[in-house]
């Protein structure tokens, strides 16, 4: 991040895409480091979820492939169960992008939404997207810092464990 900030002209936005296996909270906390916080505002955390998998009652269509990806990733520094990882990612989100909505009918989208909503501790927008095309105006400008206080008041010391995975 510091290398990006040293560039001229300075970037207007930095979008960090983490692996679907990443724990979001350590990255969010890194934006509170004094050297970073004085230069960058964390606008929000966007979590991408698999619409068809959620509609079918899971979080990924191929859990074996997901586990193989985890095992092969040498930089992965945690072994959280998939259900906890999914709950952490949903809990950190300021926006949830429901992917592959074009593969679902209205009932499937409703099932996928319900699966996500049961994980949420605070109201969080969920936007269905098709063909991987998420509207940038929805992703940029989330104003996470303005929402952070309200969220922390609501979920302070709340820890939930669920049986879903991402």
Question: Where is each model-derived feature located?
Answer:
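C-terminal accessory "lid"/substrate-recognition subdomains
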Residues: 66-166
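Nucleotide-state-sensitive switch-loop elements of NTP-binding domains
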Residues: 1-84
